[in-house]
């Protein structure tokens, strides 16, 4: 079975062709970072228009790179939600149109299920069951995963997601958009011990997250810091280090609780923030101490991409799941409402 995958939930246009025997045949990704940089964040209308401009050329390139003709495609998978409604409509409209034109089934994929299954693209894919930490700009959640579609959300952010807190704190530090990776890079120059940030919601039971207070603490710390002297950049680096350390520690504490609560020994980290070097290092140390295993997608598949959508869509198409061509995009779509396969 060979699947065309389409991802347009936010500001990346991702296209991939995946074959169940040969694996990933092609992977194209266009990021709109430069388009939105002047605005300091994603502008939904601009994102939708740029998807319209890029999606067909990227599909043609992915098909060419995969040496694949329309007659070779057995199904089309596209991100149906959650995400920006206009951006989702671009991918879903093109995906459904191609499925109709090629006379193949279409399937709508949950964006976070795509992230959750992204490590399955690797040679050392995790076996079920496992705990998944999904951390991105729009989501932070801990999920108990028994199988595809068998998801129990153990905890999630009650306000800002971890990635959103990274980006907003980076902006307060005067870093460009998207700020998360730039903050992490700045933190590499930081020194421990100069600032102590709180670890939100770790002083009480439960697995939910809250990062808005941490962002406010960072704003107050930056406001009170002397950033006019010769060592201003070092002070910023120290603040970045302390902020990142607080986020990572919080995620570590919550993951440790989830593993203890469920008795599981396998942990999957996925989503854009899973590319963070400190997070990967600390999670590896945690799982070694617990005599467990931790799994990540390759860096190319941490951010939004078509490969994860193609893979997730293939699993559902194989199970006989298809989508009516009249189906709508789902900007809001709880992960634990998906059907098990």
From Swiss-Prot:
Keyword Protein biosynthesis attached:
no
Q: Which family does it belong to?
A: Belongs to the KAE1 / TsaD family.
Q: What taxonomic classification does the UniProt entry list for its organism? A: Bacteria, Pseudomonadati, Pseudomonadota, Gammaproteobacteria, Alteromonadales
Q: Which is a GO BP term held by this UniProt record?
A: tRNA threonylcarbamoyladenosine modification
The UniProt note on the cofactor reads as follows: Binds 1 Fe(2+) ion per subunit.
What protein name is recorded for this chain? Answer: tRNA N6-adenosine threonylcarbamoyltransferase
**Record's superkingdom?**
Bacteria
CDD domains tied to this protein: ASKHA_NBD_TsaD_bac (cd24133)
Q: Where does Fe cation bind?
A: 111, 115, 304
List the EC numbers from the record.
2.3.1.234
An example molecular function term from Gene Ontology annotations: iron ion binding
State its role: Required for the formation of a threonylcarbamoyl group on adenosine at position 37 (t(6)A37) in tRNAs that read codons beginning with adenine. Is involved in the transfer of the threonylcarbamoyl moiety of threonylcarbamoyl-AMP (TC-AMP) to the N6 group of A37, together with TsaE and TsaB. TsaD likely plays a direct catalytic role in this reaction.
Q: In which residues is substrate bound?
A: 134-138, 167, 180, 276
Any single GO CC term annotated in Swiss-Prot or TrEMBL for this entry? cytoplasm
Q: Which InterPro entries match?
A: ATPase_NBD (IPR043129), Gcp-like_dom (IPR000905), KAE1/TsaD (IPR017861), Peptidase_M22_CS (IPR017860), TsaD (IPR022450)
Q: State the compartments where it is located.
A: Cytoplasm
Q: Which PANTHER family match?
A: TRNA N6-ADENOSINE THREONYLCARBAMOYLTRANSFERASE (PTHR11735), TRNA N6-ADENOSINE THREONYLCARBAMOYLTRANSFERASE, MITOCHONDRIAL (PTHR11735:SF6)
Q: Which reaction does it catalyse?
A: L-threonylcarbamoyladenylate + adenosine(37) in tRNA = N(6)-L-threonylcarbamoyladenosine(37) in tRNA + AMP + H(+)
Q: Which UniProt keywords apply?
A: Acyltransferase, Cytoplasm, Iron, Metal-binding, Transferase, tRNA processing
Q: Which cofactor does it need?
A: Fe(2+)
Q: Which Pfam families match?
A: TsaD
């Amino acid at each position: 079975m060979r699947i065309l995958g389409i991802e347009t939930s936010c500001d990346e246009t991702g296209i991939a062709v995946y074959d169940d025997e040969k694996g990933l045949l092609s992977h194209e990704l266009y990021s709109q970072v430069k388009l939105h940089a002047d605005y300091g964040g994603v502008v939904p209308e601009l994102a939708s228009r740029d998807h319209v401009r890029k999606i067909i050329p990227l599909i043609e390139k992915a098909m060419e790179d995969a040496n694949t003709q329309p007659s070779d495609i057995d199904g089309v998978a596209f991100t149906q939600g959650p995400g920006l409604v206009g951006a989702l409509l671009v991918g879903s409209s093109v995906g459904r149109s191609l499925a109709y034109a090629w006379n193949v089934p279409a399937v709508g994929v949950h964006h976070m299920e795509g992230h959750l299954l992204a490590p399955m693209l690797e040679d050392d894919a995790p076996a079920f069951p496992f705990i998944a930490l999904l951390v991105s700009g729009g989501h932070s959640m801990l999920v108990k995963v028994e199988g595809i579609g068998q998801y129990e959300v153990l905890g999630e952010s009650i306000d800002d997601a971890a990635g959103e807190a990274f980006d907003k704190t980076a902006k307060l530090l005067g870093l460009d958009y998207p700020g998360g990776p730039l903050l992490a890079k700045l933190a590499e120059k930081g020194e421990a011990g100069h600032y102590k940030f709180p670890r939100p919601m770790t002083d009480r039971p439960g697995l939910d997250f809250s990062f808005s207070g941490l962002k406010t603490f960072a704003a107050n710390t930056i406001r009170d810091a002397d950033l006019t002297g010769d060592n201003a950049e070092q002070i910023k680096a120290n603040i970045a280090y302390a902020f990142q350390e607080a986020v990572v520690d919080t995620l570590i504490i919550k993951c440790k609780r989830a593993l203890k609560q469920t008795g599981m020994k396998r942990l999957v980290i996925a989503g854009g923030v899973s590319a963070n070097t400190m997070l990967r290092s600390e999670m590896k140390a945690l799982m070694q101490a617990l005599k467990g295993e931790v799994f990540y997608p390759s860096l190319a598949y941490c951010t939004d991409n078509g490969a994860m959508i193609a893979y997730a869509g293939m699993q559902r198409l194989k199970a006989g799941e298809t989508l009516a061509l009249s189906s709508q995009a789902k900007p809001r779509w709880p992960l634990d409402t998906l059907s098990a396969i």
